[in-house]
Amino acid sequence: MDRQSLRTTLRAMDASNENGSAKGAKKTTIGSFVRWTFGFNSVPLTTLVTITTVLLGLLVYVSTSVNPPDVTEAQKPLLNYAWAQLGEISRYPHPYFSHDNDRVRQHILKEVYTLAGREHFEGAQIEVDDSQTDIFIQKEDVFDKSAPPGKLTYFEGNNVVVRLSSKNSDKSLGAILLSAHFDSVPSSFGVTDDGAGIATMLAVLKHALAQNEGPKRDIIFNFNNNEEFGLLGAEAFMHHPWAQNVSAFINLEGTGAGGKAILFRASDYGVASHYSAAEMPFASSVYQEGFSNGFIHSQTDYKVYTEGGLRGLDIAFYKPRALYHTRRDNIAETTKNALNHMLVNTIDVTQSMTEADSFDHADQPAVFSDIGGYLFIILPLQYIFVISCLTLAVGPIFVGFLFLLVLRKQINAGTSETILGGWLRSIVSVLVSVVATYFVVETLHLGNELYVVRSFYTPLFAGLGTFIFVNYVLLGFFHFVRPVCDQKLIILLELSVVLWVLLLLSVIHEATHKATGEYHFLILYIVVATASILGLFGHLVTSTETSTFVEGPEDEEDTVDASEATETSPLLPEASPDNAAPSIHGAVDPENQQEDKTLQKIAVSMGYDWSIQFLLVVPITFFVTFGLAASLLDGLHQTPLESEKSADFVYTTITAMSVLVGITFLPFVHKLQVFVPIVVVGVAVTASFVHILSPPFSSNAPAKMRFVQNINLDEGTSYANVLGRQDVLQEVLEYIPSTDTFKPNCSSRGDGVEICNYIAPRPWLIDGEKVSSDGDFAGLPTNLLDVKVVPVNETSSGPFDRFDGRFKISALNNRGCVLRFNTTRFKSGDVETGVSPVKMVTLRHNRVGKTGITTGSGSRFSMFGWTRDPKTGKDEFRSFMHGVDDVTLHKLDWEDPEYDIQLSWIPRWYEVGDPEDEGNEALKNRLGVTVTCSWAEYLDPSSIVDEQGRRRTMDKIPAFTELNNFSPAWSIWSNQGRGLVEVSKYVEL
């Protein structure tokens, strides 16, 4: 039966109905209703698309929402305790370089001893070690991988380390370490970074003591100090004797300001599997890959612990990043629910770990994610790799085999339209839509680059809407002009090919880089390939005529839409005594077959396997792709504040995510009712206008800039140096009164960042200072820093002999200084000047036999070059190959103002093989040293003495106070260096 005879038969049936054939009318009415309701046409498809998109969009929003679940009545008592601790910890900024840092430490000690003195389980043993730990280490810059390798750090640590054990504890199993840092940055109150972690640890200790019996494993709590500037508290712990017995750790962190605490890194599957015990799981291994690939530049103590051989988890608050390290990271900006989310999950995971007999799978990275905040899914990366390899091998074979069977069937039947037709149209449509999507997103990028800091949804919706609309127009047009055998199936097959290639690349990346965030491609390929197999199988089990029948647009109004017949061949034909299953060769009924059998065959050809394909493809792929987009952009969308390259990367990611989410609907888009693309394009246009016309920042998503006041005692200058994105920074400075008197001098730092400096009033960092007769803007705090050269015995002056120089640094009310070096050829921080000539640094202490834990043969770190003389109290560090590029010094004793340093250098070390320079040989042998010391306190005013001898109160750092007071609500300030004030002085040795 050809197309025309079939049409004639159907029209004859309609005429019979009009003439009063009750039976025919009933059959036609039922068939039309079923086809209209369940067939592959615009009404049921549009309904399903709408319902699916709304429900899954809400699910993704709930999954990534910043709002944690509500607190239960059972959780309130412990949460209230933790909340009170958080309030006390975060009363003031408390960086390592501040007196408030000591206040927080004393509070932690007091709470630990208070908890230990209360009732607890029988046989509880609590050990507290608050002794000082000194380390002298040379490591790469934690936050800048491009920095020279010769960075030397002397650190005096005062961690509070607590070990909880019981009579049930099995020492052979190893301990579980809980770690958080109690220091903040100078510009922040440190609520989420990392007061919440400290409060959680205190609450976990309280909870553990309240149990009926003790833990199976010891629990060690490391309340560590100075994570913010080098992860040094964790470094100090790794030299503690208790570190040798740690089996696994949980590191608690914060890089946002509230919300939900996410598991974003895990060392391996063995420890990560214990996160399954979390009551409110929130996790994604995508972020782990972001750290590995360098997309996320910050670091946590997790890095130190894993490099030291420990296994564990990294859990942190992660958004909004714009408030991170600012005064908005305070108790008012977070919630009890946020703290409870970290607390409850930490208790659950800690209990699971302490009860474990062993931690297997140490060599297997973990792939993990939560679903809706209720279910935690985890697999070893090895399993994902094996499944991916099998899928890559089996998928194409199975799909290809079925494809060839369908093609042979169609060719043998002599059909004019085969499954080979129509492959080019979707390729053209996708290419055009990708270009259009890129154009729209890039237009938004150029039109208002930084609005993405405020919301990434506007460019994402604009790009996604563009992609869907362009494909709707083009694929609908192609379908109108020349319908093909099964456009839906052809697109599914093409997507299978593309996803197969992406999966192959992902497998290669997994094998070479242990990538844990690319499992999405495996899911997408399996889903799309399965839908393709269903479509091919449907063609095999139906008759050739009904499975390949093509209807043109002119027949859309006929009783039976033939084009829909081709798009939706049934998965399985209906069985009845009068309708046997068609043969593989597609034999059809004779011309004289009864009309009701013809109607039945047509109804069968309207099969509803499309709905199975839809429900298989759209919900899963949309949830996976949109969830991936939301997760990635949640973590990245505020990074454009840091550089232009970051902005470029974010908008490129938005374009890619728009396409990835959009392909979800690609096989079905040409059948949507017209109002859907109209709504889609309306959303895209609205989102574009909002993006272009709205201010880029708001009080909830402010522009973050950085401040430090630099005082050069040699030049007699005091400048406020502020760093931020170009144009934005200068706009903010227009609000600052001081810049009217002292115009900022701005220069580009490259990558869309500029630095401006202007004359700033002197800081008042020491109580009792006297004001200058010339006013606040005159005079420098010369009493803060002094550097005196101490004579040493002369050494040989041969071209490759060692030179020694000694000097003492006197820095009042100070805990940290940095030494940078320069010669005629070398300059610290400049990798192009070669290897540093400084080969040995000696630090003398005022207290002979200074306490501290030194490294031994059993240390996890091999501290090559560090030696200590217990009789003289000298620390020495030798670094002959790399040299010492710079030295960072820390000290805990506020009453001891001095650092006593001796340097040994070889001026010609780096000149080997180079011709001798002409000039003053004595000048070549000299070593220049710039001493820069930092001060970090600003909130409490200082008491000073004016010209008449009267006491007055002054802001400690007037320039920073002015910025905080006068900057617009859509901007906020963070520290640029270790402190808020840096005072420098230069000497030559």
Curated annotation (Swiss-Prot):
Chain residues that bind Zn(2+) 2: 193, 228, 325
GO molecular function: metal ion binding; metalloexopeptidase activity
Chain intervals with Acidic residues compositional bias: 552-561
Record's GO cellular component terms: vacuolar membrane
Cofactors (names): Zn(2+)
Residues noted as binding Zn(2+) 1 in the record, renumbered to the chain: 181, 193, 253
Glycan attachment points: 245, 745, 793, 822
GO biological process, one term: proteolysis
SUPFAM superfamilies: Zn-dependent exopeptidases
Keywords, ordered alphabetically: Glycoprotein, Hydrolase, Membrane, Metal-binding, Metalloprotease, Protease, Transmembrane, Transmembrane helix, Vacuole, Zinc
Region (Disordered): 1-25, 548-576
Entry's cofactor comment: Binds 2 Zn(2+) ions per subunit.
One Pfam family in the UniProt entry: PFF1_C
E.C. number(s) listed in UniProt: 3.4.-.-
Membrane side Cytoplasmic: residue ranges: 1-41, 405-426, 482-488, 542-611, 670-673
Residues of the site described as Transition state stabilizer: 324
Transmembrane segments: 42-62, 384-404, 427-447, 461-481, 489-509, 521-541, 612-632, 649-669, 674-694
Superkingdom of the organism of origin: Eukaryota
Subcellular location: Vacuole membrane
Chain's role: May be involved in vacuolar sorting and osmoregulation.
Record family assignment: Belongs to the peptidase M28 family.
Protein name: Vacuolar membrane protease
Source species of the chain: Yarrowia lipolytica (strain CLIB 122 / E 150)
